[in-house]
């Protein structure tokens, strides 16, 4: 099976990591974490079995070095679907594109924007909605 790569991109503090941590929790509930040490609510990647797929989620993605580390993790886990946060700056998106190219695929980019002047509860709902959207894409 060819690896699918999904990149959640946006500027700093727009909720990318929070969204992917919600996705990790959704996958934990609907599937099965196969990481030796689960990492809820952190930038540490985690791998799940979901609907017969191996899905790796990496909430960290602020720099090229972090995304390159995520990509090594994806390769090590031999996942069917790799999901990483990336920034719009600092080379992280380029690193994910380069990894996708090395795998012979293209990144499925999903934008994440920050809505100013929203309550924390509303921001959390927006992050949850994006996480549910990502889950449906699997």
Where are these regions (language model features)?
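Short, glycine/charged-enriched secondary-structure capping and boundary segments
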Residues: 22-23, 71-72, 96-99
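Glycine-rich phosphate-binding P-loop
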Residues: 4-27
């Amino acid at each position: 099976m060819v690896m699918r790569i999904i990149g959640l991109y946006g500027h700093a503090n727009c909720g990318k990591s929070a969204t992917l941590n919600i996705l990790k929790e959704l996958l934990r509930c609907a599937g099965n974490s196969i990481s030796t040490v689960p990492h809820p609510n952190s930038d540490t990647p985690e791998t799940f079995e979901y609907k017969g797929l191996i899905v790796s989620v990496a909430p960290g993605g602020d720099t090229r070095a972090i995304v390159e580390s995520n990509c090594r993790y994806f390769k090590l886990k031999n996942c069917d679907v790799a999901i990483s946060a990336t920034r719009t700056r600092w080379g992280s998106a380029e690193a994910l594109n380069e990894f996708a190219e090395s795998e012979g695929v293209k990144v499925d980019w999903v934008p994440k924007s920050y809505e100013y002047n929203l309550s924390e509860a509303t921001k959390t709902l927006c992050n949850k909605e994006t996480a549910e959207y990502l889950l449906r894409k699997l």
